[in-house]
Amino acid sequence: MTLSINDQNKLDAFWAYCVKNQYFNIGYPESADFDYTNLERFLRFSINNCGDWGEYCNYLLNSFDFEKEVMEYFADLFKIPFEQSWGYVTNGGTEGNMFGCYLGREIFPDGTLYYSKDTHYSVAKIVKLLRIKSQVVESQPNGEIDYDDLMKKIADDKEAHPIIFANIGTTVRGAIDDIAEIQKRLKAAGIKREDYYLHADAALSGMILPFVDDAQPFTFADGIDSIGVSGHKMIGSPIPCGIVVAKKENVDRISVEIDYISAHDKTITGSRNGHTPLMLWEAIRSHSTEEWKRRITRSLDMAQYAVDRMQKAGINAWRNKNSITVVFPCPSERVWREHCLATSGDVAHLITTAHHLDTVQIDKLIDDVIADFNLHAA
């Protein structure tokens, strides 16, 4: 089988488009400085990781051995003994969050899910798909959950088994919910630790906080029950993917044996991408802890540079602690469209992921934002 000349030209044009725009992204969390050339040879195979990487599967073309090593890495990163954990490589942050919410619902079938207004939009879909009771909690101006409103809603609901959805870096403002404060308040309200579930959405910050000196609490050692992180954001991948880690004792409650594949089914999806575990495996094997720290430090320094430049020009730019998300007043549509910025209400943001090796692109954006600000202030 061969493509027509027109179809081949269409592909060639798209290739040129991708090359031109490879490093365009400054408004969304995506690291483009990856190189998985070593893995291109595996694209000729239909690698499918259906089932549990810890068990035999009758579908032999899987990358379970690599996925297991990926999960060992993230169990250690998120401070839970590997043998007490279970998780898998997902197709992105939404699946990881659904898995966490699913576990919470199975443990507490009548529980209510509490999440803040700044939570990722996918959680509203998850609520509908799982048919789980839910309450939207107010957010503080910086995007952090309003702890007073959280406890008020739990009290008003007389909820004995709350399911808490904590943000470890909100989508728009990069805010981190204080899970220590949440647990302290739940304890003060008389809710025992075994009577609630705590999921952490660390899509972006899950690969930032482990590599800073003054990280906010976010790990299993800090009290979470499950956590999701994206693979294509700080790590970088040509295919969207993610990682979810949970307590094995909770996952075992949902495990079902499937004779079709001679394995247990614990995952949200059946067929799973077998290539993304290879990419994540190569990424973690080819970067030392010190290299990750350097990448994160550079990204944080770049974010602070953007804040300082905008503030010097009189623009109210800011960022949360340990965040590479820089928030500022939303510029005109011409500017945010030209720079592909994410906007929400009256604010926009830029995100300094690791492929920004210099300030050229950031400076161009800031110059346009300053000019736009001055134009409309005149």
UniProtKB/Swiss-Prot annotation:
One of its GO terms (molecular function) is histidine decarboxylase activity. Keywords: Decarboxylase, Lyase, Pyridoxal phosphate. Its cofactor is pyridoxal 5'-phosphate. InterPro entries: Group_II_Decarboxylase, Hist_deCOase_bac, PyrdxlP-dep_de-COase, PyrdxlP-dep_Trfase, PyrdxlP-dep_Trfase_major, Pyridoxal-P_BS. Its EC number is 4.1.1.22. The modification N6-(pyridoxal phosphate)lysine is found at K233. The active site is at S323. It catalyses: L-histidine + H(+) = histamine + CO2. One of its GO terms (biological process) is carboxylic acid metabolic process. It comes from the Bacteria. Substrate binds at H120. The keyword Cytoplasm does not apply. PROSITE patterns: DDC_GAD_HDC_YDC. The keyword Lyase applies. Pfam families: Pyridoxal_deC. Homotetramer. NCBIfam families: PRK02769.1. Belongs to the group II decarboxylase family. This is Histidine decarboxylase. It comes from Morganella morganii (Proteus morganii). The lineage of its organism: Bacteria, Pseudomonadati, Pseudomonadota, Gammaproteobacteria, Enterobacterales. The gene is hdc.
